[in-house]
From Swiss-Prot:
This is Polycomb protein Scm. Keywords: Chromatin regulator, Developmental protein, Metal-binding, Nucleus, Phosphoprotein, Repeat, Repressor, Transcription, Transcription regulation, Zinc, Zinc-finger. Residues 806-876 form the SAM domain. Residues 560-569 have a biased composition (Polar residues). Residues 1-57, 535-621, 652-692, 713-735 are annotated as: Disordered. Belongs to the SCM family. The gene is Scm. SUPFAM superfamilies: SAM/Pointed domain, Tudor/PWWP/MBT. Changing residue 834 to T: Complete loss of function. Significant loss of self-binding activity. Moderate loss of ph-p binding activity. GO terms for cellular component: nucleus; polytene chromosome. Polycomb group (PcG) protein. PcG proteins act by forming multiprotein complexes, which are required to maintain the transcriptionally repressive state of homeotic genes throughout development. PcG proteins are not required to initiate repression, but to maintain it during later stages of development. They probably act via the methylation of histones, rendering chromatin heritably changed in its expressibility.
Length: 877
């Protein structure tokens, strides 16, 4: 039992402060709240404990009533001869009943049944008393002393206040603020800095009264609370339906407490408290039961809330009284250690930094100096760090000395350290930056680093992979909680994080590890947008705004951007299918009639070899583009062609398409192909006798659509006209981009365009050797053709038509092809043997309960199951 928490007093200082209210001395539960044994700021060591530092250890204290020595003695009853300690409210109540009937004259203990004498609890006490008072045993003084003791016992049993008697229930020393301020050379914070009344409000509440209060763990709920303790101007409340472990304290002028009926008048509804021990459906009946014949607190005893200060007027170093958040029944001597905006850092005098906290300057948990004395509330004096080394305080105080290392001065900044998140910056492959907060604040650098890791993990899209990366960092091992899970990470040791520079280095390492933008987390709030991410975003917007847009176009742009960093020899990309453009525009060209350089011939020969080797699994279109060079320069002026659609036929004249192979154009051609779901036997047969490129094209039977746009410069409509595709050169190189593909096969009749005068013609495909003789440049651009099917569609095409017949591997294949993030659950499906039949029966509750899936993946899989059921129903129709 901590002596400072007991507030033991001598006979000369046993009286309460002037004006002590009746409520402060009315019940045992109030004493219980004010005499808790847990260590806290302001709890001091009693003189008795300091005297027992040598020799034989002190005898373990036991409950005065039941003799229990294992339970903490949380309840103290001051008496004439000292104090009585108890383990529970029941023990202290029973002791008071027995004490009112009579007490031992020698030891002041209760006289139980079977005692040898009505005045003594035991023979030993009787013998001691006889030896001590043998000469005056029959004198009148003994009788008068006995009469005084009986009157005091009756006064104690009645519970009435005794301002000057030794049996006052709550007695405490009045802290001398003037002497303390003079000793420390500091000043007290003025009353205008606090959101507190000038004079502490009267507390007319009584234990057992019921009222409405906001649940401190869920401030949106209004619950029924019972007053279980009264101390000065404060109330100890317990939510009905909750246990005693969640009691909380409120001032009588708080806006969080109201009279019964206030919630209903304002259109609200009383809610069960968080952690309601009964069934939620029984709440209405339970509410009627507890309010029936209850002692309801009258509305007039609730005090109005005081006005709040207009701004933060605190100064560093000012003294005040503050509630200990870890032991809220205590108000202790404290100091303003730091100020930042609306926040102040409260430190408790004489204690290490474990109990310090940040709060708003409008907080109701801070009071001006002298508030406790005026409100008759016990005030805990400053602690003494030197006493923590004594053996008795080590046993009584739960604050270990090694905690000082975690809160060393090197780790505590002058003001709270703050890290700012910039959601506009890229979060990389592991972080969803939309889930990041704007900022986090920590009292120490290490705490801030831990908070940053916690927020990054909470916003992660793949916590399993990211936690491995964070654990690979250097530093001390810590456990952080994010998204309902515990993760083991590493944070630099306190000795390495001494200033902002070290913290900034850690944040930079964190961003690099997460593959995010270096400006995603910073110690300085930057209003300007990150230039790197802004430029990247502008490029994406420009690319997405360029019509027409398609996945093929994006793939081409990615390849073009990658080609800037590759050597010229790497720019020739392997292709599975080479398509020669059958479009030729009339242009004025000046060509070199000399022989083609050997490098160009080698490149063309390499291209033809690649075309022949990759024709079996063709998914890409490679179009040879010839820039304006020394050997071939073009200055074409053409009119924009609306659309040229052509189909592959068996009677394609490949020789006619190769006659104009030396003519070049600088037009921009948008090539789009679509995969034809139905196959044509005659077309594939007729194409079998052609070259490798021709046979490959015939295999897909996809109509190729060319949309030609001239360059913006030198556009002369009079010099442009359409040519029949049969007369267009197949070797004419056109810089290409891809338009939106067609979704189905088109017949020969549907490809004719009457409005623009564009006729549908046969697709001309040059032989493999034609490319070698054409005067073309060796630069090639590879773009993805829409002929290639998406991964999910290609994977699903191999599945059986009926999902009910799917095997386990087919189910896993279907899920992985539709959502790559669900691929990690493949082994789980194998473990539970989820085949097609089981897949159709899955629901989110079943997957979460029996398969251990989280809600997010379970909902994704349910969505895929619904798609399968929809397709199944369509097939049945």
């Amino acid at each position: 039992m901590s002596g400072g928490r007991d507030s033991s007093t001598s006979s000369g200082s046993n009286s309460a402060a002037p004006g002590a209210s009746t409520n402060a001395t009315s019940s045992a539960s109030a004493s219980a709240s004010s005499t808790s044994t847990s260590a806290s700021p302001g709890s001091t060591t009693s003189p008795a404990s300091t005297q027992r530092q040598r020799g034989r250890p002190a005898k373990r204290a036991t409950c005065t009533w039941c003799g229990e020595g294992k339970l903490p003695l949380q309840y103290v009853l001051p008496t004439q001869t000292g104090k009585k300690e108890f383990c529970s409210e029941t023990c202290i109540a029973e002791f008071r009943k027995a004490y009112s009937k009579g007490a031992c004259t020698q030891c002041d203990n209760v006289i139980r049944d079977g005692a040898p004498n009505k005045e003594f609890c035991s023979i030993m006490c009787m013998n001691k008393h006889q030896k001590k008072n043998c000469s005056t045993r029959h004198s009148g003084g003994s009788a008068s002393g006995k009469g005084l003791a009986e009157s005091e016992r009756k006064l104690l049993a009645s519970g009435a206040p005794a301002p000057t008697g030794p049996f006052q229930y709550e007695s405490f020393h009045v802290f001398d603020w003037d002497a303390y301020l003079e000793e420390t050379g500091s000043e007290a914070a003025p009353a205008k800095c606090f959101k507190q009344a000038q004079n502490p409000p009267n507390n007319d509440f009584k234990i057992g009264m019921k009222l409405e209060a906001l649940d401190p763990r869920n401030v949106t709920s209004t619950c029924i609370a019972t007053v279980v303790g009264v101390l000065g101007s404060r109330l100890r409340l317990r939510l009905d339906g909750s246990d005693s472990q969640n009691d909380f304290w409120r001032l009588v002028d708080s806006t969080e407490i109201h009279a019964i009926g206030h919630c209903e008048k304002n259109g609200g509804m009383l809610q069960p408290p968080l952690g309601f021990r009964m069934n939620a459906s029984s709440w209405p009946g339970y509410l009627c039961k507890i309010l029936n014949n209850a002692m309801v607190a009258p509305e007039e005893i609730f005090q109005p809330e005081p006005p709040e200060p207009e701004e933060n007027l605190f100064k560093v170093g000012q003294k005040l009284e503050a509630v200990d958040k870890k032991n809220p029944q205590l108000i202790c001597c404290a100091t303003v250690d730091a100020i930042k905006d609306d926040q102040i850092h409260v430190t408790f005098d004489g204690w290490r930094g474990a109990f310090d906290y940040w709060c708003n300057y409008r907080s109701r948990d801070i009071f001006p100096a002298g508030w406790c004395a005026r409100s008759c509330h016990p005030m805990q004096p400053p602690g003494h760090k030197s006493r923590m080394d004594s053996s008795s305080s080590k046993q009584r105080c739960p604050r270990p000395r090694y905690t000082v290392v975690a809160e060393s001065e090197a780790m505590v900044p002058a003001s709270p350290a703050t890290a700012h998140f910039h959601p506009n910056c890229k979060g990389g492959p592991f972080i969803n930056n939309s889930k990041l907060p704007c900022m986090v604040t920590g009292p120490t650098y290490q705490t801030l680093a831990k908070l940053c890791l916690q927020e990054v993990l909470a916003a992660s899209t793949d916590t399993q992979q990211l936690s491995k990366l964070l654990f690979a960092l250097e530093g001390d091992v810590h456990i952080v909680t994010a998204a309902g899970k515990n993760f083991t990470v590493k944070i630099p040791s306190p000795m390495r994080m001494k200033d902002d520079e070290s913290l900034a280095q850690f944040i930079e390492t964190l961003c690099t590890t997460c593959r995010a933008c270096a400006n995603l987390i910073s110690l300085v709030h930057e209003t300007e947008e990150c230039k790197k991410c802004a430029n990247s975003r502008k490029r994406q917007l420009t690319q997405s705004a360029t019509p027409p847009s398609s996945p093929v176009l994006a793939d081409k742009r990615n390849r073009q951007s990658n080609s800037a960093t590759t050597s010229p020899s790497e720019k020739i990309i392997k292709q599975e299918l080479a398509v020669k453009s059958p479009v030729e525009s009339k242009s004025k060209t000046s060509t070199n009639n000399g022989k083609e350089p050997a490098s160009q011939q080698n490149s063309n020969h390499s291209l033809n070899n690649n075309n022949n080797s990759a024709s079996k699994s063709s998914n890409k279109v490679v179009i040879k583009s010839e820039p304006n060079g020394a050997n071939a320069q073009t200055s074409s002026t053409t009119q924009a062609l609306r659309k040229v659609r052509f189909q592959h036929h068996a009677n394609t004249n490949t020789n006619s398409s190769a006659t104009n192979g030396n003519q070049d154009t600088s037009q921009t051609t948008h090539v789009s192909t679509s995969h034809c779901s139905s196959s044509s036997t005659s077309s594939s047969t007729s194409l079998a006798g052609g070259s490798a490129n021709t046979s490959t094209i015939g295999k897909y039977l996809a109509p190729l659509v060319a949309e030609v746009h001239p360059e913006q410069a030198n556009v002369k409509p009079s010099n442009s006209y359409y040519k029949s595709p049969t007369t267009l050169s197949s070797s004419a190189s056109l810089p290409t981009s891809v338009s939106t593909p067609f979704t189905g096969c088109q017949s020969a009749s549907s490809t004719a365009l009457a409005a623009g005068g564009v006729t549908a013609a046969k697709a001309a495909t040059a032989p493999a050797g034609a490319a070698a003789t054409a005067g073309a440049s060796p630069s090639y651009t590879a773009i993805t053709s829409p002929v290639s099917t998406p991964t999910s569609a290609l994977a699903n095409s191999h599945l059986r038509s009926q999902p009910i017949d799917w095997t386990i591997e087919e189910v896993i294949q279907y899920i992985e092809s539709n959502d790559n993030s669900l691929a990690v659950h493949g082994d789980l499906f194998r473990k539970h043997e989820i085949d097609g039949k089981a897949l159709l029966l899955l629901n989110s509750e079943m997957m979460m309960k029996y398969m251990g899936l989280k809600l997010g993946p379970a909902l994704k899989i349910c969505n895929l199951v619904n798609k399968v059921n929809g397709r199944r129903n369509n097939l049945a129709l």
